[in-house]
């Protein structure tokens, strides 16, 4: 397996990206990494550490797409950027999955222009994993589509259900529509129509869910528009950091609590791993005709390492093929109904 990595995308590139890749290959097996970007800068970082040269290679790209760039213009004009080159290598099957911490708009635009949508998919979406009382849940869409049509919600639910089944092994994922109330008929007209479409879909749709239901793990897949999903995701990350540091502060308040903290040291590490955004970072763009993973622009080396390992596991699944097949089946069903 070859993981294509945009070495120049993100606030902390290329240092955090390259070091994260080095950490990933030292911790996990089963994949190679092709770093795409300025070869001189990448090699300078690589030379500071010892690593298995058979597992990390470089593909030079002379340009960088920054957060200041207009997505469509950047994809069309910066042909030798690390992001565009990465997409082209993926399309040419020179790699199995592409990972970038770069400009989100450009990543979406590049995925659509170069890879294209899976046939039948109207709008791709980001699926972000978050910790819940039940284990883990998926927020979809987590930031790509700020305005959605009813059919988009339906397709998000289908793709999210397949992802959770293939990635986490949940046999029949429960899917809920994020709304202002759990009762049928809640929300605006778009959400009401989305509810009807989801109800008719071949997934385990359990109805509307409210914001508090997400953390309680009442569903495995939370369907929403990208604006709402991104706000929910960022709140999740901020709240996790706040509560962990709040507990940590209380535990270190005095001698008595410090003694208790010493006994709970291992448990605190488990808690940190559950609540830490660096542990849960990285999300697939579902619906494009290729495996693409997005991570925060602020990703550090630890985040990148974790995302690469997660991306490698995603590439091992049959999620992309299953999504393709599901939309083929839906198209056949629509034709049969028309007849």
From Swiss-Prot:
Keywords: Cytoplasm, Lipid biosynthesis, Lipid metabolism, Phospholipid biosynthesis, Phospholipid metabolism, Transferase
Pathway listed: Lipid metabolism; phospholipid metabolism
Record field: catalytic activity: a fatty acyl-[ACP] + phosphate = an acyl phosphate + holo-[ACP]
EC number: 2.3.1.274
BP terms from Gene Ontology: fatty acid biosynthetic process; phospholipid biosynthetic process
Principal location: cytoplasm
N-terminal signal peptide: none
GO terms, molecular function: phosphate:acyl-[acyl carrier protein] acyltransferase activity
UniProt subcellular location: Cytoplasm
SUPFAM superfamilies: Isocitrate/Isopropylmalate dehydrogenase-like
Pfam families: FA_synthesis
Domain of life: Bacteria
Gene3D superfamilies membership: Isopropylmalate Dehydrogenase
InterPro entries reported in the protein's UniProt record: FA_synthesis, Phospholipid_synth_PlsX-like
One CC-aspect GO term: cytoplasm
HAMAP family from the UniProt entry: PlsX
Classification via PANTHER family: FATTY ACID/PHOSPHOLIPID SYNTHESIS PROTEIN PLSX, PHOSPHATE ACYLTRANSFERASE
Family, as annotated: Belongs to the PlsX family.
Annotated function: Catalyzes the reversible formation of acyl-phosphate (acyl-PO(4)) from acyl-[acyl-carrier-protein] (acyl-ACP). This enzyme utilizes acyl-ACP as fatty acyl donor, but not acyl-CoA.
Subunit structure: Homodimer. Probably interacts with PlsY.
Name of this chain's protein: Phosphate acyltransferase
